[in-house]
Design a protein with these regions (language model features):
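A sequence-level/structural motif corresponding to short, flexible coil/turn segments enriched
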Residues: 1-197
């Protein structure tokens, strides 16, 4: 459900996007042409398995194109950003590809949602991408929930990848009871700050 409001919070328009099954909404951002691009999960059928779903709309919420990515298992998108080199970088998680369980799933597309490359990251347990931001050197920093590595239960992970999706480094933070990360921001001089609970 995409809703546009004015500065007073009054609704200008709204549009419902999806199938007759349980689709999932992730992130939505405004694009340079005044439209919007959304990422989430499109239900494959009634069994609740989804594919990563990207929807591009114009400034009034009318769909201009859609793309879906993934395999026969459940895959979903959680975040998206506009790449400075053109196109979009999509973050999510996949059960169709990777090392088993749920893995981090990154897809790079052109301006029309055509895939240029995709990569997975993670171990044999569940690792789920939560948010992605641009790094100062042109790569990307990913915040994720990790069970494959770290101190046990659900720890927070930070993953640095290049602009081509190659892993540069990864870190995990957390204790035996788990520490979910809630926000990741670039501050200055190549440094980052993360809020956890």
């Amino acid at each position: 459900w995409l809703i546009k409001t004015n500065q007073s919070g009054l609704m200008d328009w709204n549009v419902c996007l999806g199938t007759n099954y349980n689709d999932r909404a992730g992130q939505a951002i405004q694009t340079q042409d005044g439209g919007f691009i959304l990422v989430g999960g499109k239900a494959q059928n009634s069994n609740d398995n989804t594919n990563v779903w990207v929807i591009k709309t114009n400034s009034q919420g009318d769909t201009t194109w859609t793309q879906s990515f993934g395999g026969s298992e459940s895959d979903s998108g959680t975040d998206i950003l506009v790449d400075e080199n053109g196109g979009y970088v999509i973050l999510g998680d996949t059960e169709s590809y990777g090392n088993g369980g749920k893995d981090i799933y990154v897809i790079k597309t052109d301006l029309y949602g055509e895939q240029e490359w995709s990569k997975t990251y993670g171990g044999g347990s569940d690792d789920s991408g939560q948010s992605i931001i641009k790094a100062s050197d042109g790569g990307y920093i990913i915040r994720y929930i990790v069970e494959s590595f770290g101190a046990g239960n659900s720890s927070v992970g930070i993953l640095k990848i290049s602009q081509d999706g190659d892993e540069i480094w990864s870190k995990t933070i957390g204790g035996s009871y788990g520490i979910p990360g809630n926000s990741l921001q670039y501050i200055d001089n190549g440094n980052y700050v993360m809020i956890c609970s």
